[in-house]
Amino acid sequence: MKAKKHYGYARLMKILQPSKDRVEPVCPVARQCGGCQIQALNYEKQLEFKHNKVRNNLIRLGGIPEELLDEIMEPAAGMKEPFRYRNKAQFPIGRDSDGKLTAGFYAGRTHQIIPVPECDCVLGVKENKEILDAILEFMQVEHIEPYNEENHSGLVRHVLIRYGFRTGEIMVCLVINGKTLPHSEKLVKRLTKIPGMTSITCSINREKTNVIMGTKIQLLWGQMYITDYI
């Protein structure tokens, strides 16, 4: 795809012989989705890949001597269970090829939405599915359209979800292409049934931009923040 002086960028076209380190991704759309590009790599090799990526950047961009990194840099710390760990998720909202309302992630290097199967991304917390299901059902019932970036029409652009692993607190923010979210009280009534719900807001973003969040936040219910502990 692109060649630099000391390295290049490439795209996988065909697998002739699978590596011994290749595994079957847990998510069926991992290959198309831009959310977890190395899920087909076994976890130990993922940690090694991330370690080397940081190391190479420190050498190439930071000018740190290799000998010093060999002496002080420790291996990447892993997890017992490398799923359900992300405390933040941003889902673009749109329609699939059949016209059905959907939430997902952008395919790599595009703005094509790859729907998350059953609205349940294996990297995010399980509560995300219930939240997305509630929002999509609300939009369907109330005839609220998703944002269309081609003609700048529609209302709901993204859904941002944050989760506090230590506190169990949940924040939901709908990014909208408008001043208000119609019938928001109905959505609030549904979302507040989810244990841990603490903050429900709207972010106003009416610009023709790739930037997700707007500059103005409307509080629909609860408080403007959640808390967690490190």
Q: Language-model segments: which ranges?
A:
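Accessory RNA-recognition modules of RNA-modification enzymes
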Residues: 1-230
